[in-house]
Structure formats: C-alpha cells, structure tokens
Amino acid sequence: MSTEHRRSRHRTTEAEPSPQDLEAQQEHRRLERRTLLKQALGLGGACAAAGWLSLAPAEWPLSLRDPDGERGKPKPRLRSLPAGGFAVPDVPSVADLAVAHGTKHKEMLKGALDALGGIGRFIKKGDVVVIKPNVAFERPAALGATTNPEVLVALIELVREAGAREVRVADNPIESPESCFVRSGIQAATQAAGARLYLPAPNEFSMLGTPGATWIERWPFFWGPFEGANKVIGVSPIKDHNLCRASMTTKNWYGLLGGRRNQFHQDIHGIIADLALMLRPTFVVLDATRVLFRSGPTGGNLGDVKPGNTLVVSRDSLAADAYGWDQLLERKGEALPAYFEKSAARQLGQPDWRKLSLRELSVG
C-alpha cells in the first residue's frame, strides 16, 4: 500500500469536531481574553492608585508618603492607673488627718499612721510600694527645697517592716537627676534603707491616659517604677512657690510627668488639679520638718527656711495641703490657691480640713 494511500485512509478515520465543540472552544477563548483584559486593567489601576497615593499629602489616611519615618514606628501603648487609684478602704472610726510634732522622725511617722489606723491598714505583706519624694532641685536638704532624707528613711523602714516585698523610690527632677539625687541625700537614704532607686531614663516612660484631665489626658508618665506596684505614697516638703503660691503633696506628682511639662506653667492650678485626678495615693506625708516659707520653690538661702518639726499624714492630699497652708506656712486668712477649688469640684478631696477628724500628737 502506498504512503499516500495510508495517509488518506488515516485522515478519513479521524473524527471531525462537532458544531457544539467548536462553539465551546470559541467561548473558552473569549473568556480567556476577557480575563486577561481585566487583569491588565486591574494591574494598571493598582499602579495608578499607588502612584497617586505616593503623591498624596502625608496627613491623608491612605497616603503612602512618610517623610519623617513615623508611619513605620509602632504606636505607643496607652497605660492606665487603677480606676480607684491606690487608696485603701475607709475606716470610719479613725482620724482622717494626723499631725505629729517632734524631732524623732520614725516615731512621729509611726504615731501619725497609728492615728489613721496603723501602717497595717495601708501596707500588707507582699505589697510593691512606690514612694515619691520631691527631689526637683540640686539642693542640700537643709535648704528645704527637697524631701528630708531622714524622713524618707523612716518611711521606707516602716513600709518594709509592714511586709512590703519591694519599695521603689522615684522622681523626675527638674535639674540633672543624678546630681539632684546625690546632693539632696535621697540616693544615699534610699540605698541605706534598702529600697530601689529609679532614675528617669527615657525607656522608663510610657504614655498615660487620664480620662477627664484638662492638660494630661494623654501624657508621658514615669511608668517604670509603677509596673507591678499596688501602693503609692507621696512624701514632699512644704514650701513657698512663686507660681502656685505653695508646693505641697498634690503638686508633688508633677515629678512623675515627662515631656515638655514646663508648658503647664501657663495654667499651674489647672495642672495641679489634673495631678490630683491622675494619681490617688495610698497616703501622703507632708514633710514640714523644715518649712521653706519664702523664695520657693528653689530656695537657696538658709534664711528662707524655718524649723517646722512637723509631719502631716492623710489619705487626702487636699486636706494635708490645706492644713499646711493655714498652720505651717502660717497663711491662715489668705485665700487658698486656686487648685484647691478646682480639685474639690472634681470631688478629689476636702480642702476644709476642719471638717475632718483630726488627731494631733507630740512625739519626743
């Protein structure tokens, strides 16, 4: 059989495609063309959109522009303090305000705390306690601008004897922190009493939320020492202040703020009222062993300081401050600084200390 004959025979045995098969093949080709066209258009649109977004203003939500590199940084975690602060429950049968006079600081402090129900009311075994002194300036304690280190030692010892697992001392001074802690004697006192000192390194700060605050609803806060803490005590000197008229236990919390806090001087009473809202302590100690009665808050002259030989202890910082204003700065009859009214309007304390239960004692 010839080759040509075999080819002819083979062609006649192949099945011819049906009209339905031909139509299906054509439809498949049309779908493929449409799919390719859509993909091409989609890719072109995405490229065009990306090009446009790369040119859109940086503040636009979908803009791809990031001239400062901020978009790639993680958002800071917003911290919060306990809703009820660090306060302990009320005990109706004890004093609200205790005033101890004398020169033996530990005995004075213990006596004042006993009048409020005893140190055991405030500090339990296993507590982690933050103590906030005022170490704002590079001054020796004798000038009255910073917390008396002897009072701090007495306070740390009482807290540790009550069973605290850890005691932390922290402040963010206005002047050089290292120099302030050394010159004031607070560093040596902290170490001698067995507490841990926190210096305000940048990584110790976090953004804190304070709902309802006027100035610091979201503000950098000295968070490091507060991590895991469940009790907070403020211990601050009593002193004249050229802006807010007096710096005492409520103003003391200013030393926990970071950022550009000097801007708050434009509304000093407003920021102090915010501080009262921000932090509600376990108790406060108004250190009036010395009284800086003029040239505050920095002082600098022994002639501006007088002996006070007094410690005021309360859960209510407004009450402690108001007592200090009237009786220790001896400004009774003068109107209280405006932060008292602003804080009281938020129900953050009682500036009329005479309405509270007061216990006064002399020790040594």
Question: Can you annotate each of these PLM segments?
Answer:
Residues 7-13, 31-35, 134, 170, ...:
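Small/flexible residues
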Residues 1-31:
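N-terminal secretory signal peptides
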Residues 18, 29, 35-58:
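N-terminal export signals
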Residues 30-31, 35-36, 129, 248:
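Short alpha-helical segments used as structural interaction elements across diverse proteins
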Residues 50-143, 147-171, 175-364:
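Extended, low-polarity segments enriched in aliphatic/aromatic residues
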Residues 13-17, 39, 138, 257:
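A periodicity- and composition-biased signal for non-globular, repetitive helical segments
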Residues 34-35, 39-40, 133, 252:
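Hydrophobic alpha-helical segments, especially transmembrane helices
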